[in-house]
Amino acid sequence: MRRLLPVTDLTTSTPGPVASADREWTLDELAEAYAYPGDGRPWLRANMVTTLDGAAQHDGRSQGISCAADMRIFGTLRGLADVVLVGAETARREGYRPARAREAFAARRAAAGQGPAPVIAVVSAGLDLDFSLPLFVSPLVPTLVLTGAGAPADRVRAAREAGVEVVVAGDGAGIEPARAVAELVARGHTRMLTEGGPRLLGQFVAAGVLDELCLTVSPVLTAGSAQRIASGPGVKVPERFSLTSLLEEAGFLFSRYGKNGKN
């Protein structure tokens, strides 16, 4: 892996180990490269992968367009987060399990006052979820379910009977993105990460609550009708983000884009 941006001593042609040589980065180096803002303000970032022709999935899953370096970054972003938000459809399709504690991040998380692993927060309007799965019954830290006040009462009851904390973050059937963020922050989860899917990310984009996008560009073409990284109603005025970091490995590009004025 090599750093392309920002241009620093590490990206010059200076000979030696600090040059932009193609090598595997340590988890500590990745953690520094993807650190949250140090001032403690709430921060919502998304982590997504896309092909050259804009597909966010292949055969319904993201794994087919990912790579080992992308998965290292995926693990790093989880290792830094207080909470991971995921849409119910993505949780089902990708077979989400409880986040695990990783020794490589233990000291860093303890120093930041974080638990041993990030909380998984599943976003669902209908709560069509199997609450007997390990994600809900055997997590290291309790899983949350975010929904609206109009969610089916029997499914809310089923979740609570399984010991799941149901967080109401909207007056209708689904969540209101800004309210969901506020509910998480109120629980001390200021370092927020969403892994999609496209529908959930589209909601955050449309509501203007996304602070950062970590986007992997996979050097493949898939054609077909796969979703983009964000779907749903469009925004009236496109919101501008600025490129803050760019890494490369084996043709994959790993970018960070921050909302203008919040970098």
What is each model feature region?
Residues 1-263:
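Enzymes that bind and transform nitrogen-containing heteroaromatic metabolites
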